[in-house]
């Protein structure tokens, strides 16, 4: 009798994706983050679903409904904090996943990489709209400031902003549509993640050496299933510790004040995972220029395959490129720190320098260094 795992139409797909999938024998723990992102997405959809059962997307009751969830719903506080901090875990895994792709040259799988960038944009949009829903001070003013950036678009800007707002300011219509989009986008993200995997399985996984691994493959199960379970346990332990011991560590205290259009908070800032992009936005004095830099700070990932001048795919055997990669990581930490600081000296100039270094490293310094390394190979 034929094995149902290999003959059943649905089981066949699962089998070829998670069981019999030929996988390079030398992939390290940096390859765990794809599965961790899948777990994060499922956790966010489930906790979000239970929150949506009790949440009301009305300006008069949104803040109260979140309070009601935390105080009156059975384990509502747990669901709410798992969802809020789960978003932070999601972005930690995302940044590490993208960093892994940059370091080991995974961007050479063009379709997989570009869908990944699209996924990053979609997750960022989802997270931004989710932050607006509790309708605290930072929710309201964050929504006002970020949506207002679209008014920098020539000619159609003002009309576009009012169309998104559904009025002349961030109000009930805005909150309702943000809730609708925040609910639907994770399912679109899940579908895109499926396409992301589809394209990845066309080529097979990359590996730390960057070399073709067709001669040395092992089945995904049990070797990498057990490895992914270990990664998942570490992530779940970290998330649980965060949720149960300091659930508000990554949030903003201002969001415990109900939204008030008549009172602006002293420092408007987004969640920590957007601070690097926010710092780049603020470092340019011109509004349109800032918006372009903000979009380009993420969109630049799409042109990285074009900037790959090295003869080797991975940075594993390229020490100069490795140094530059870690300088880029340090620069992103600097930008994240600056994004959370007030707009005053010396933070402004540090932010501007860090922004210039960010774009210079990716567009100029790293490609030139790769070319120098190519010459060094001949020695």
From Swiss-Prot:
Record Gene3D superfamilies: Cytochrome Bc1 Complex, Chain C (1.20.810.10)
Spans through the membrane: 33-53, 77-98, 113-133, 178-198, 226-246, 288-308, 320-340, 347-367
Transmembrane listed as a keyword: yes
Stored Pfam families: Cytochrom_B_C (PF00032), Cytochrome_B (PF00033)
CDD domains: cytochrome_b_C (cd00290), Cytochrome_b_N (cd00284)
Function: Component of the ubiquinol-cytochrome c reductase complex (complex III or cytochrome b-c1 complex) that is part of the mitochondrial respiratory chain. The b-c1 complex mediates electron transfer from ubiquinol to cytochrome c. Contributes to the generation of a proton gradient across the mitochondrial membrane that is then used for ATP synthesis.
Family: Belongs to the cytochrome b family.
Name of this protein: Cytochrome b
Gene coding for it: MT-CYB
